[in-house]
From Swiss-Prot:
A Pfam family: G-alpha
Protein's organism: Drosophila melanogaster
Binding-site residues for GTP, renumbered to this chain: 50-57, 186-192, 211-215, 280-283, 357
Tissue: Preferentially expressed in the nervous system and in the eyes.
Gene Ontology biological process terms in this record: adenylate cyclase-activating dopamine receptor signaling pathway; behavioral response to cocaine; chemical synaptic transmission; G protein-coupled receptor signaling pathway; imaginal disc-derived wing morphogenesis; instar larval or pupal development; learning or memory; neuromuscular junction development
Compositionally biased intervals (Polar residues): 1-14
Region listing for G1 motif, in residue ranges: 45-58
Lipid positions (S-palmitoyl cysteine): 3
Family listed: Belongs to the G-alpha family. G(s) subfamily.
CDD domains: G-alpha
Protein name: G protein alpha s subunit
PANTHER family listed in its UniProt record: G PROTEIN ALPHA S SUBUNIT, GTP-BINDING PROTEIN ALPHA SUBUNIT
Residue segments, region Disordered: 1-31
Region (G3 motif): 207-216
Length: 385
């Protein structure tokens, strides 16, 4: 008779193979977890914080332009509706404010009154489809001195920053073959609600940037992003010194930003996380200071006695900069630094930079300057420095 293995022996072989297979799977999972852990630890996580309309989302767009593949033609075309909405919101807001300002503003040309009626009566409809006459009325109104005077008083009501930019470009945007350029994409205003993550790589270093809505009712979501953050990039609109919040017309926007920065700086969960401070919208700040219509001292009396520091720190003073503009931007910088130096615990630091988020070269230079700072923060985070 032939020899046959016993049932017990066969079962033992099967169990042995199962055990080996399970071990191989376990080892593979362990290796993958180790790789994931290494990748996680090698990734710089940047949290963009700041009050609403400070320019955070524009910074994210710049990262896409500089470090990803920018925006495809199809993505650009998808922004056309948002850009048209920016034009509609701008002309609706400006013409609507003419009668509510104190003192009110009258149209220069009486024949433009039907145009205003059209804008207010029809363009305000949610299903408005932007017929050719809308652009014609908008272009003619934008030439009216009364409308322009109302625009110049935009700190007295709520108007998007990109209003002038897009109203100046109506003749281009109304073209059926129009495709937005990068500057159009950068300036297009869309309210950020929720948390948006952008991933990119610079010199083989991985970055994850989280953009969170800055309006008051969005800030409760911030706590979800605080875990394992390498650094916070706090963005403030320096040009907002003469403006009030959309959600609270009694609160100055720049003071709100200072209060928000203080609450983040002193947050007990963030006491070891340094902040890179983007003092944004320097172009708009310079325009306002040079125009002289809204003096910084009228909103911040401390500015009257402020002297520009001899040591200008990390910013480059251009030879053609207006001395009053220089004094204004350093005053705002020092208001934030006064908060960051008050604690003096040495556990985290504030690194200020003057920025113009719609200027790609400026953001490229500033972010390159920040990379070494971010790397040091990352090494310190994992106790490698």
């Amino acid at each position: 008779m032939g020899c046959f293995g016993s049932p017990t022996s066969k079962q033992s072989d099967v169990n042995s193979e199962d055990s080996k297979s399970q071990k191989r799977r376990s080892d593979a999972i362990s290796r993958q977890l180790q790789k994931d852990k290494q990748l996680y630890r090698a990734t710089h996580r940047l949290l963009l914080l700041g009050a609403g309309e400070s320019g955070k989302s524009t910074i994210v767009k710049q990262m896409r332009i500089l470090h990803v593949d920018g925006f495809s033609d199809s993505e650009k075309k998808q922004k056309i509706d948002d850009i048209k909405k920016n034009i509609r919101d701008a002309i609706l807001t400006i013409t609507g404010a003419m009668s509510t300002l104190n003192p009110p503003v009258a149209l220069e040309k009486k024949e433009n009154e039907p145009r205003v009626e059209y804008i207010q009566d029809y363009a305000s409809s949610p299903d408005f489809n932007y017929p050719p006459e809308f652009y014609e009325h908008t272009e003619e109104l934008w030439k009216d001195k009364g409308v322009l005077q109302t625009y110049e008083r935009s700190n007295e009501y709520q108007l998007i920053d990109c209003a002038k930019y897009f109203l100046d470009r109506v003749s281009t945007i109304k073209n059926p073959n129009y495709t937005p350029n990068e500057q159009d994409i950068l300036r297009c205003r869309v309210l950020t609600s929720g948390i948006f993550e952008t991933r990119f790589q610079v010199d083989k270093v991985n970055f994850h940037m989280f953009d969170v809505g800055g309006q008051r009712d969005e800030r409760r979501k911030w706590i979800q992003c605080f875990n394992d953050v390498t650094a916070i990039i706090f963005v403030t609109a320096c040009s907002s010194y003469n403006m009030v919040l959309r959600e609270d017309p009694t609160q100055n926007r720049l003071r709100e930003s200072l209060d928000l920065f203080k609450s983040i700086w002193n947050n007990r969960w963030l006491r070891t996380i340094s902040i890179i401070l983007f003092l944004n919208k320097q172009d708009l700040l310079a325009e306002k200071i040079k125009a002289g219509k809204s003096k910084l001292s009228e909103y911040f009396s401390e500015f009257n006695k402020y002297q520009t520091p001899i040591d200008t720190g990390d910013a480059i003073m251009e030879s053609n900069d207006d001395p009053e503009v220089i004094r204004a931007k350093y005053f705002i910088r020092d208001e934030f630094l006064r908060i960051s130096t008050a604690s003096g615990d040495g556990k985290h630091y504030c690194y200020p930079h003057f920025t113009c988020a719609v200027d790609t070269e400026n953001i490229k230079r500033v972010f390159n300057d920040c990379r070494d700072i971010i790397q040091r923060m990352h090494l310190r985070q994992y106790e490698l420095l």
